[in-house]
């Protein structure tokens, strides 16, 4: 009886490695379930990319009437932070932690930066579009700060997450692990694009703020 159960388990494992996508990316120290949980940060990164470059890019120019030069500058700010990935990776490589977690503090910090930038963004949009008694540059400056915080959080979380995945993967499975992580990034971008399109089909100013707050 035990032999038949063992044979059934072996056949089931072989079926998984044969038919499940990226099942061969798993290893003894990094199971497929653990790898999928680790790759969740790529979904949020893909969502933030679509929200910044796909949704707010058009909405701020067409619907909110903001100058295209301001919007293009805001979108360029996260890209200008890309060279900081080298410093982030170096710091996470040499980070000393009493718990032995080198990457987790950076991954957590990047996620919190994304949350802070997206949570602050609705207030920045209100300052840009609604009349207020403050200086005129207050709204664009607040929007740039939220874009900067979100973009920096994306770079920090993605750099630390990819480094953590490559640390846990074996040398043989490392290429497939990285491929799975970038597949999750594409899934996050495609899924969030469809969701944002459905939610903003009947566009409204309040609806836009609700969508951004939900994304945060």
Residue ranges and their predicted role:
Residues 2-216:
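Membrane-embedded alpha-helical bundles of multi-pass transporters/translocases
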């Amino acid at each position: 009886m035990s032999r038949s159960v063992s044979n059934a388990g072996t056949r089931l494992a072989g079926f998984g490695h044969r038919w499940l996508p990226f099942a061969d990316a798993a290893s003894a120290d990094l199971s497929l379930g653990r790898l999928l949980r680790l790759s969740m940060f790529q979904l949020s990164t893909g969502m933030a990319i679509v929200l910044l470059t796909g949704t707010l890019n058009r909405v701020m120019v067409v619907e909110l009437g903001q100058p295209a030069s301001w919007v293009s500058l805001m979108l360029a700010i996260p890209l200008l932070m890309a060279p900081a990935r080298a410093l982030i990776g170096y710091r996470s490589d040499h980070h000393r932690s009493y718990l032995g977690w080198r990457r987790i503090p950076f991954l957590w910090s990047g996620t919190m930066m994304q949350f802070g930038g997206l949570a602050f963004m609705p207030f920045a949009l209100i300052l840009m579009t609604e009349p207020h008694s403050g200086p005129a540059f207050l709204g664009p400056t607040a929007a740039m700060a939220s874009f900067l915080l979100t973009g920096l959080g994306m770079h920090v979380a993605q750099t630390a997450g990819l480094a953590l995945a490559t640390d846990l993967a074996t040398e043989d499975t490392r290429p497939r692990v990285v491929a799975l992580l970038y597949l999750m990034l594409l899934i996050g971008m495609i899924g969030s694009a469809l969701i944002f399109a459905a939610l903003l089909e009947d566009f409204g100013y309040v609806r836009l703020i609700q969508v951004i707050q939900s994304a945060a």
